[in-house]
């Protein structure tokens, strides 16, 4: 494209920026492909080992939890590029609700208020689809970054919307084992246990709907700061700058910045942390007899959650959504204390109703949670 004249570049960009929906998923796919990299072949023997470990995991998990057991989906041991392609829209709940806000900010009336954008020729006709294009860039960048970080669906911190297929991203699990000096076979079993556990949690009938409700409530409070974006648009001196802005490079990661309501953010943080913390506890119990190195694996994984990474930093900057996944450790301690005080059945009550999930404050106050959930329910039963 760089060899074309200005009008040729604009024509190509115009085609890429076209979208019939709130998000330009064609542009998202291009950005994701660029970031995820080329496909890698997965050793068939390793893939088969993962599938066998998933069957072992199903049996072990059934022995330690009453979580619903959906029809087991075949575990997909895959590479980064394939995972990214098959999950391109799995996290659309984090992007699509923002389209209405952007529509108001990028309509023709708003853009006419920017003197520097006047008289820019072909660029003016490209600004109409700016909102869907911006969201496409953000969606593609988010999934592209995730593909290099996530160990499986369980390690995204976010329920997938499009499908129920369990995945492990083999190169990332291999890197995790190497980075922490842990036996590959133990990491593979641990990864399979986590993915199967997450798959079961996602089978709770209200889980995905509740997450959507929390995200939509949170996004009602999000306000975008468009100054950086408009500054880039007004400062453009050539068409290649426009091309770079919608490419998979550092220019794309800071197009939008958002502020949001901290209390509604805490609701999402509690939701995702509890799912991860509960899963940690299940995996720890299910793998105790099979994984002599489970303490090292869990320590490394918890430490990893506290480390900054591009996917989560991008999500925080783009939408103001900071998951604070390190809270999973607090949630796991909450689970342990509830079971110690009131038994496994008390903890299992969480899955009966979305309002029974603990808040961030209740992670350190299980007695308060008990008073809100268990005692209130007991009182209702005696009426």
Segments the model singles out, each with a brief description of its role:
Residues 53-171:
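Auxiliary, metal-adjacent structural segments of Zn-dependent hydrolase domains
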Residues 172-193:
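Short pre-active-site segment immediately N-terminal to the catalytic Zn-binding motif
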